[in-house]
Regions:
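Bacterial N-terminal signal peptides that target proteins for export
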Residues: 2-12
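A terminal-accessory region detector
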Residues: 479, 586-674
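Substrate-recognition/specificity elements adjacent to catalytic centers across diverse enzyme folds
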Residues: 27-290, 295, 301, 398
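Bacterial N-terminal signal peptides
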Residues: 11-22
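Hydrophobic alpha-helical segments
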Residues: 410, 447-550, 612-617
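Terminal end segments
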Residues: 529-584, 662-790
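Glycine- and hydrophobic-rich flexible loops that cap the catalytic core of alpha/beta enzyme folds
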Residues: 271, 312-322, 331-335, 340-487
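Proteins synthesized as precursors that undergo proteolytic processing into mature forms
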Residues: 96, 107-108, 129-130, 427-453, ...
Length: 790
């Protein structure tokens, strides 16, 4: 009976809400304690807020109030994830995730970070938090967002540090090099030297290098100070290659990380993939620059981005932010536009620590007692009852960082830039929101200490640029590509790469710049830790080719490039198979007619992708998955094209025989997976990403959180990435009213709202929505106005 009454109340409440927000031109006035003056919040047809205030305090207050009104439960879940407090709601199911976050200790880090913020930054965070709390104060048991009522709890007051800790989630999503260090050690131990050396060679003929140059690919140099020498150094220090149990523990820990980040939309595959590019006016149809950006993160409902237009005497800015974070993270102001993609440098190091029987850890100064802190996690005993019981864990912290792996008598500690309380990204975005030119753009980024990013730039005067920003460590010895011996000083961080030494471009002769997580600097760059871990070059190369051919770029042609699904490596492989007659007549005919695009109805795309995976596994001699993955991503394309004898597996006379074997195995695998009817063997069956709410699978109640079931297609090697384009921006400096900005679903986190998924159709089809900016365009778009008054 209780659930029936609750359901009826919800239906009535949401029906009333729908009527209120649908009245065209409605004006509403609300008294809110904490404001210094009146604030105007206007909304357009997509409920995108346009907020104007007489001072920055009230602007951030109103932004917090507005975002909380649309995404309060999402905000609460993000801070709970980063603080390790989800088991209080979900019980044992997420306890391991909470333990991981508690070991990382970000709650303590952000508390310490506040002392390093300038007064205006602290005021912005405090004003935003006050606005969130003012909205929370308006809620009662009937008006709480539905997720709170289902889970039977109420939101705690928002704190300024809650906004800061969301930045730590992003850092976690964009940094996983510690596990790569272990995998590299495994690769070197398990592969013949010639194979490992070729895998360790970072160069690829499809690379899009923006800074510096490469030694010619035809003459591979001997590695200097990289994996081989570092491994020899490690062994001389008594560090053995990570054993299978250590690697298994690392994989489990990374799986916990993936589950945790995916639940709130922050997990990203393929080294946190994203695309951005900028085109100068000399290559555009109207003579003005165009900037594009589409970050790739996990599909979730609601999406991780929230659109905001903010205006005060110090700025006018529009774009997206994370719910819970003041200001705009990616977007534009009156003068400049900016976008970002992940760089992927090595900002994490593992240290094999030596402990004695007394629990002390070995250091260069002798045996020392590590810091040990106790963390208490409240764990819900029953999903239908909010009562909890405490679970305590002890976290050991050495001088290098917290111990995150303890297996087989070995303990590994993690050092990470995100653990430094001085490293925050909020100050940089605060500056970007107000920057007027290239120099002010660089000044803002010079203080950026978050996950390293490729920031692209365009301004209303026609200038374009690119600058890497982030804290990238310098080591006393080696480059951090393998675990260090924690008892020595070899892994000591001696500083960070200076901002003016980070790769950058300003108005390059080419007239455009593209980054897609590729290796952006040549092998002549002095800091190898910046260019060692990166995504494959395929997306960057495809975008480079499209932009090179587009002499008169438009918003429409840029949008088409964002939606492009041509797959370079699979197209190359299909041609090689056809040329060698390396498959059955049916397969050869199918591949010969393929256009190289990962269309959802493509049979060829599905089959050749399956064949590629088979080839990689056989080249790795069907051994552990790590070598197979490295082979597929690093050298398979070249090995097949050049018929490299080094990579031809034993038992095969030549590559044609290898291709035929993989064709047979792939067809058999697809028959088992999809049935004998080949008409249903289409790429859309394998690649579709779907948006889902964290509660969508809950019995009885999950259906109300359903999102569109349409598949979202692409692949990891195409500009239109399958998993997952989290938003699309096309900014047009000098003509801001033609800027396009679209998120996957909608502004509201309320599944009953008309704005829960009203942007999906535009997002799915690539027809991005115009985002008005001028006062005249905004005025014409407004359908509802709310005035907040003190």
């Amino acid at each position: 009976m209780f659930m029936v009454k609750l359901t009826l109340r919800l239906i009535a409440f949401h029906a009333l809400l729908f009527v209120v927000i649908s009245v065209h031109g409605q004006t509403e006035s609300i008294r809110v304690a904490g404001l210094r003056g009146p604030v105007t919040i206007q909304r357009d047809n997509y409920s995108r807020p346009f907020i104007s205030a007489a001072n920055d305090h009230d602007l951030y207050f109103a932004q917090g109030y507005t975002v909380a009104g649309d995404r309060l439960w999402q905000m609460d879940m993000m801070r709970r994830v980063a603080r390790g407090e989800t088991a209080e709601l979900t019980g044992q199911r997420t306890l391991e995730e909470d333990k991981r976050w508690r070991r990382l200790g970000f709650a303590k880090t952000v508390e310490e970070s506040v002392a390093y913020l300038s007064p205006d930054l602290r005021e912005a965070l405090e004003a935003y938090a006050a606005g969130v709390n003012a909205y929370i104060a308006t809620l009662d048991d009937k008006t709480l967002p539905i997720e709170f009522r289902i889970l039977q709890y109420k939101p705690k007051p928002w704190r300024p540090t809650d906004s800061l800790i969301i930045g730590k989630i992003l850092a976690d999503a964009l940094s996983s090099t510690w596990r790569l260090d272990l995998l590299k050690a495994q690769l070197q131990a398990s592969l013949p030297k010639a194979k490992f050396d070729e895998l360790a060679d970072v160069r690829n003929e499809y690379d899009v290098i923006l800074f510096g140059k490469d030694v010619p690919l035809q003459k591979p140099p001997r590695s200097k100070g990289t994996f081989a020498e570092l491994q020899q150094l490690a062994r001389s220090k008594g560090i053995s290659v990570p054993t299978d149990d250590i690697l298994a523990a690392a994989e489990r820990l990374d799986g916990i990380r993936e589950r945790s980040l995916s639940s709130i939309g922050f997990f990203a595959e393929d080294l946190a993939a994203s695309n951005n590019w900028v085109i100068s006016g000399k290559r555009s149809a109207d003579g003005k620059p165009i900037l594009a950006n589409d970050p790739h993160l996990a599909p979730t409902a609601p999406g991780i981005w929230y659109l905001s237009h903010l205006e005060s005497p110090t700025m006018r800015v529009a774009g997206v932010t994370f719910p819970g974070v003041p200001g705009v993270v990616l977007g534009h102001n009156e003068h400049i536009a900016w976008g970002a993609t992940n760089v992927g440098p090595d900002v994490q190091d593992l240290y094999l620590e030596t402990f004695n029987t007394e629990g002390k850890v070995k250091t260069p100064a002798g045996w020392e007692a590590p810091k040990v802190r106790t963390e208490t996690i409240n764990v819900r005993k029953n999903p239908l009852n909010p009562a909890t019981e405490p679970v305590t864990i002890e976290v050991t912290e050495t001088r290098n960082g917290p111990v995150i792996i303890e297996e087989g008598g070995k303990r590994y500690a993690l050092k990470w830039t995100a653990q430094d309380p001085k490293n925050s990204d909020f100050a940089a975005f605060f500056g970007l929101n107000r920057a007027k030119n290239w120099d002010e753009f660089k000044a803002a980024l010079s203080g950026y200490r978050g996950a390293s990013q490729n920031f692209v730039y365009a301004d209303t005067k026609g200038n374009i640029g690119w600058h890497i920003a982030g804290a990238i460590p310098l080591r006393k010895a080696g480059d951090g590509s393998l675990p260090y011996d924690g008892s020595t000083n070899d892994g000591e961080w001696t500083g960070f790469i200076a901002f003016n030494e980070l790769p950058n471009l300003y108005n390059p002769p080419s007239g455009f710049i593209v980054t897609a997580n590729q290796r952006i600097a040549g092998t002549d760059y002095k800091y190898p830790q910046l260019i060692r871990d990166f995504a494959t070059p395929w997306r960057a190369r495809r975008l480079f080719d499209l932009l090179s051919a587009d002499q008169k770029a438009t918003v429409e042609s840029v949008g088409a490039a964002q939606f492009d699904s041509f797959n370079i490596p699979l197209s190359n492989l299909a041609k090689e198979i056809v040329k060698a007659k390396g498959a059955s007549d049916t397969t050869n005919l199918l591949l010969a007619g393929w256009d190289g695009k990962m269309s959802p109805d493509s049979q060829a795309a599905l089959l050749v992708n399956e064949i590629r995976g088979c080839l990689a596994n056989k080249m790795a001699d069907d051994s552990k998955p790590a070598p197979a993955t490295a082979i597929r991503e690093r050298i398979l394309d070249r090995a097949v094209r050049e018929r490299s004898p080094l990579w031809l597996p034993a038992g095969f006379a030549d590559y044609t025989a290898l291709m035929k074997a993989c064709d047979t195995e792939s067809v058999s695998a697809l028959e088992k997976r999809y049935g004998a009817d080949r008409s249903v063997w289409i790429w859309g069956k394998a690649s579709a990403s779907r948006l889902s709410h964290p509660l969508v699978s809950a019995p009885l109640i999950g259906g109300q959180f359903a999102t569109p079931t349409d598949g979202l297609y692409g692949s990891g090697q195409t500009p239109n990435v399958a998993s997952f384009v989290s938003m699309r921006l096309i900014a047009t400096p000098g003509n801001w009213d033609t800027t396009r900005h679209t998120i996957p679903l909608g502004q509201s986190g309320d599944p009953k709202s008309a704005h829960y998924k009203d942007q999906f159709e535009a997002y799915k089809t690539g027809n991005s929505l115009v985002y008005p900016f001028s006062k005249e365009a905004v005025k014409a778009a407004i359908v509802r106005t709310v005035s907040l008054k003190p």
